[in-house]
């Protein structure tokens, strides 16, 4: 079943997920240098929580994401959670008011006016461009994980970070816990999958941290070979710093409503 899920998502039309159409070439500018952070808040009543940091040095970025409470399994196997930095819109996270069709789920497309299209795919290996946006084979999986990777950051995403419109979004809801109106609905990205499989579960607007940044508190980034989960450690100092970013994000989101 998981192989079918992977195949379906890999074949999903790129434009449907909201790709920017730009390549993954590294940027030459360093105007986005600094450390950005956010508290990841639940979307679609996912019950999940998380933190994210992006440290930009020159054209390289080191991204760290910690999550817990996500959907754990799909068809009996570890649930893959595609994740991205979305760009080019308001730089905010959607609310249930953005559920345009009233089915009880804010799907990826309905969330785009808030967070925009994919600028960077936060994959475990390989391509980090928008075209890798639905590749679940390189997505972290399970209900809790710590993700960390350093890679060349494209210019469009650097522009978004510098302009305050970069948003981290983690996708994938448990289909069994969704509203009845959406339970039988297929994804508007990959019609062979349930809508919940590609809907956003976590979201956070990235804000630049004070000079010097903060300790991430990551003590382990071990990815389980069977469960797809990883240990998660949230340092107190980092939580405080990320909390400041959350307050800003919440104010920005409230301004939309």
PLM regions and their residue ranges:
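N-terminal leader/targeting pre-sequences
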Residues: 2-7, 12-253
């Amino acid at each position: 079943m998981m192989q079918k899920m992977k195949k379906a998502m890999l074949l999903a039309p790129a434009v449907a997920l909201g790709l920017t159409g730009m390549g993954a070439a590294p940027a030459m500018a360093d105007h986005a240098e600094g450390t950005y952070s956010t508290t990841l808040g639940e979307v679609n009543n996912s019950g999940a929580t998380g933190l994210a940091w992006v440290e930009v040095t020159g054209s390289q970025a080191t991204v760290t994401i910690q999550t817990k409470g996500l959907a754990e399994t799909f068809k009996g196997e570890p649930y893959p959670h595609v994740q991205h930095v979305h760009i080019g819109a308001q730089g905010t996270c959607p609310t249930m008011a953005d559920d345009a069709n009233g089915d009880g789920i804010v799907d990826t497309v309905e969330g785009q006016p808030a967070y925009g299209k994919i600028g960077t795919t936060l994959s475990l290996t390989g391509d980090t461009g928008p075209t890798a946006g639905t590749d679940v084979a390189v997505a972290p999986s399970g209900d809790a994980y710590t993700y960390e990777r350093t890679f060349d950051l494209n210019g469009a995403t650097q522009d978004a970070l510098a302009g305050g419109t970069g948003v981290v979004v983690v996708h994938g809801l448990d289909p069994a816990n969704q509203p009845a109106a959406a339970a039988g609905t297929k994804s508007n990205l990959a019609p062979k999958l349930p809508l919940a499989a590609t809907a956003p579960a976590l979201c956070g607007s990235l804000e630049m941290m004070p000079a010097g940044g903060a300790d991430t508190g990551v003590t382990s980034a071990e990815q389980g070979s069977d469960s797809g989960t990883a240990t998660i450690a949230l340092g107190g100092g980092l939580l405080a710093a990320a909390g400041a970013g959350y307050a800003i994000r919440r104010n920005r989101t409230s301004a939309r409503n």
